[in-house]
From Swiss-Prot:
Source organism (scientific name): Bifidobacterium animalis subsp. lactis (strain AD011)
Keyword field: ATP-binding, Coenzyme A biosynthesis, Cytoplasm, Kinase, Metal-binding, Nucleotide-binding, Potassium, Transferase
Name used for this protein in its record: Type III pantothenate kinase
GO cellular component term, pick one: cytoplasm
Keyword Metal-binding: yes
Lineage: Bacteria, Bacillati, Actinomycetota, Actinomycetes, Bifidobacteriales
Length: 252
């Protein structure tokens, strides 16, 4: 098995992979002040919870948008697993043709998302990742990444609303029962949800209008589970791990 690690701005998600199948996942909060030993102990705990051991892990691959944390993770894997992990970045074969102004600016996580969507579902496909930011990336039928969009994630919007107002509280991000909110908490939850949902639906529609072609829409990321609207064809919470497994296979 291989260990796939997605280091994001808000969370680190660790996946135990058997080929392209995700055996188990483990989500922890991203903290730049954790030592490599602390991350190593978390990895061992995850393996134990997955009824696995370090001996079961043959290799590892990392996708990271937080360089400081990535370096700690690399050290932890070398020390606790005896593995120097593969890093998604320059020089790595992905099978994807990045046809954007600055290919190096495309985050490793988004590249893995696109690889996962294209290898699993084919193209053309619009990949939506709902995390700290909500991102959209369009992949054509030949596997070329042609366009990307970045906007505020719903969790980030909720945190900004609470921190920049005197009396509005922090609220849990959830799908509201109704848009007819009768108190402040429900009003915030419904407002945040439907504002974000409306943005997602309009953005998908705009892609269809400008591209004038049919394509699949695949959503992933921590918040995708609450936004399974009719315009989204597939919600795949392990999409990035499928992409990381695909990239790994091209480089061994």
């Amino acid at each position: 098995m291989i260990l796939a690690v997605d280091i994001g701005n808000t969370n680190i998600v660790i996946g135990l992979m058997e080929g392209t199948e995700t055996v188990d996942t483990y989500r922890i909060t991203t903290r730049s002040n954790h030592t490599s030993d602390e991350y190593g102990l978390m990895i061992l705990q995850f393996l134990q919870l997955s009824n696995s051991s370090p001996d079961d892990v043959q290799d590892a691959i990392i996708s990271s948008v937080v360089p400081k944390v990535m370096h700690s993770f690399i050290s932890s894997m070398i020390k606790f697993l005896g593995i120097d992990p593969m890093i998604i970045g320059p020089g790595i074969k992905t099978g994807m043709n990045i046809r954007m102004d600055d290919p190096r600016s495309l985050g490793a996580d988004l590249l893995a998302d696109c690889a996962g969507a294209y290898t699993t579902y084919g193209g053309p496909v619009l990949v939506i990742d709902m995390g700290t930011a909500t991102t959209y990336n369009y992949v054509d039928e030949k596997g070329a990444i042609l366009a990307g969009l970045i906007t505020t994630g719903i969790g980030t919007a909720a945190a900004a609303l609470a921190s920049n107002t005197a009396q509005l509280p922090e609220v849990q991000i959830t799908r509201p029962k109704s848009i007819l909110a009768a108190n402040t908490k429900d009003a915030m939850q419904a407002g945040l949800y439907y504002d974000c949902l409306g943005g997602i639906e309009r953005t998908i529609t705009q892609f269809r209008e400008e591209l004038d072609t049919d394509f699949k829409v695949v959503a992933t990321g921590g918040m995708s589970r609450i936004f399974d609207c009719p315009l989204i064809d597939i919600v795949d919470p392990t999409l990035i791990f499928k992409g990381m497994a695909s990239i790994y296979a091209k480089n061994v």
